[in-house]
C-alpha cells in the first residue's frame, strides 16, 4: 500500500504539478512533505501529516521552511 501511494505522489510531481505550476507556499512542497512523511511514519500517520500541511497551504499563510517532524525517541 505504501509503495502505491508513494508512486501516485511521484506521478503527481512529475506529470500533474508541472502543468498546474508551483503554488505551494512552503519548502519542501506539500507533495514532497507528504512523500517524506509517509516514508518516515507510514501511510496512516504520514497521510495525516500531509493533509494537515495541505490545509495550512493557502494564500493567507506566510509559508516558509516546514520540514517533516523528526521521530521522537521513546524512553
UniProtKB/Swiss-Prot annotation:
InterPro entries: Membr_insert_effic_factor_YidD. GO terms for cellular component: plasma membrane. Keywords: Cell membrane, Membrane. It holds the Pfam family YidD. Its main location: membrane. Signal peptide: none annotated. It is found in: Cell membrane. The keyword Cell membrane applies. It is a peripheral membrane protein. It comes from the Bacteria. Could be involved in insertion of integral membrane proteins into the membrane. NCBIfam families: membrane protein insertion efficiency factor YidD. Belongs to the UPF0161 family. HAMAP family: UPF0161_YidD. This is Putative membrane protein insertion efficiency factor. It comes from Carboxydothermus hydrogenoformans (strain ATCC BAA-161 / DSM 6008 / Z-2901).
Amino acid at each position: 500500500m505504501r509503495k502505491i501511494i508513494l508512486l501516485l505522489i511521484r506521478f503527481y510531481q512529475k506529470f500533474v504539478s508541472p502543468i498546474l505550476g508551483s503554488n505551494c507556499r512552503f519548502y519542501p512542497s506539500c507533495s514532497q512533505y507528504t512523500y517524506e512523511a509517509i516514508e518516515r511514519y507510514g501511510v496512516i500517520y504520514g497521510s495525516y501529516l500531509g493533509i494537515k500541511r495541505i490545509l495550512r497551504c493557502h494564500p493567507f499563510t506566510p509559508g516558509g521552511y516546514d520540514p517533516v517532524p523528526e521521530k521522537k525517541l521513546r524512553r
